[in-house]
Every structure is written in C-alpha cells, then in structure tokens.
Amino acid sequence: MKRTYQPSKIRRKRSLGFRARMATAAGREIIRRRRAKGRKKLAA
C-alpha cells in the first residue's frame, strides 16, 4: 500500500513556503502569529 505522505521539496515550498504565505492575507496572519509566538522557523 502506498503511504499518504510522499515528500517533495518543490511542492512543500510552493504551498507552505514563506513566499506562498506572504502572497495571501491569511498567510500573512499565519506568519504574524508565528512571529508573536517566537517560532524559530516561520515557514517551511
């Protein structure tokens, strides 16, 4: 049986990367919340 998680660096960066987050208002909100929380990594 094929597993559900098939890692791909390109797919990860395109959907969850910093530039992808900054492209939408909701994404910018995620970055803002992660900064406020003090996350070392803001995006994938």
From Swiss-Prot:
Query: In terms of domain of life, where is this protein from?
Result: Bacteria
* One Gene Ontology term from the biological process aspect of the record: translation
Question: Which Gene3D superfamilies did the record assign?
Answer: 1.10.287.3980
State the GO CC annotations: ribonucleoprotein complex; ribosome
Report if keyword Ribonucleoprotein is assigned. Answer: yes
Q: Which Pfam families match?
A: Ribosomal_L34
Q: Name the keywords, alphabetized.
A: Ribonucleoprotein, Ribosomal protein
Alphabetical list of PROSITE patterns matching this protein = RIBOSOMAL_L34 (PS00784)
What GO MF annotations does this protein's record show?
structural constituent of ribosome
Q: Which family does it belong to?
A: Belongs to the bacterial ribosomal protein bL34 family.
Q: Which NCBIfam families match?
A: rpmH_bact
Q: What is this protein called?
A: Large ribosomal subunit protein bL34
The species is Nitratidesulfovibrio vulgaris (strain ATCC 29579 / DSM 644 / CCUG 34227 / NCIMB 8303 / VKM B-1760 / Hildenborough) (Desulfovibrio vulgaris)
